[in-house]
Every structure is written in structure tokens, then in C-alpha cells.
Amino acid sequence: MLTIHASCVAIGGHAVLLRGPSGAGKSDLALRLIDAGAMLVADDRTQLQRQDNRLIASSPGTIRGLMEIRGLGPVRVAAAEPSRVHLVIDLVPPAMVPRLPEPRHESFLDIALPCLSLDPFEVSAAIKAKLALERAAAGRLFEPAEAQLPRRVLRAS
């Protein structure tokens, strides 16, 4: 088992790790994703475990379901069961977010995961994270967008 400095939320059983130094916006973005339907897996410290060829995220038992919200303190939220991680999002300042990201991966416990960089305080950060997680869970994060459109849409163009 590996414990990392990251928050983690899950949507439909698919988890995303939100990484960044203290104050980078991990809990802030996680809270906005929870407001949009995600569930908290872990806040600030995430345990990773390898199961077959899957990486599973969970919360240390002492903080399960607890989220530290700046200005409010610790708040209890609904906690997700351990969830399979499909994506890592590094939280960075706006100038460090590439307009067109190159494919990038990072390994945890010998399992490679796709990585993206996002500005967590951008108004659209939560929807970008949600869309990226959907694409990563389907194995299509770095495919060109037109490859993901239904054929009927491509024919109409």
C-alpha cells in the first residue's frame, strides 16, 4: 500500500486523484466535483493499493468521510467505497496549463495512469475534470476529439 498527498473523488465508481501542494486547491476542486455529483474517496491523503492490474484508492480510516474546507474546518461528507483510479490531475497555476496537452503518464505501484494539468480555481475546472475522467475511464483521454464523435455527427459535417 502507498499513501500519497492527494485528494480523490469518484464518479460512478471511477476515481480521479487531485494532486498539488498544500493550498493548491485539492479540497476546493473536490468540493465542487462533489457538488456536481461526485463522492469523496479521500481528502488530502489517499491510500493506493494494487489489485490485479488496477489501482484502487481509499481513505485512511481515521479521516474517511471527512473533508477539511478552508474557512469552515472539518466537515463530514458522504464517502465513496474504495474506487479504481483512472486519472491523475495535477493542480497548477493558469500559466502552467497547456492549451493542447501532450500525452503524459505516471506510474503508481507499477500501474501507469494518464495525467493532466488543470488550474483548480478556473470556473470550468470541475466540468473539465469530470469530462477528463469520463474520457480516461473509457481509455480515450488522449484521442483526438473527432474520434469520439458518433458517426452520424461526423457524416452531418
Go through each PLM region and give its residues.
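Short solvent-exposed loop/turn micro-motifs enriched in small/polar/acidic residues
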Residues: 1-2, 41, 82, 98-99
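Pre-Walker A adenine-sensing motif
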Residues: 1-9
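A generic local structural motif
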Residues: 3-4, 26-27, 74-76
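Glycine-rich phosphate-binding P-loop
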Residues: 9-34
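Conserved nucleotide-sensing/catalytic segment adjacent to the nucleotide-binding pocket
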Residues: 35-93
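Conserved NTP phosphate-binding and transfer environment spanning the P-loop NTPase/kinase superfamily
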Residues: 85-157
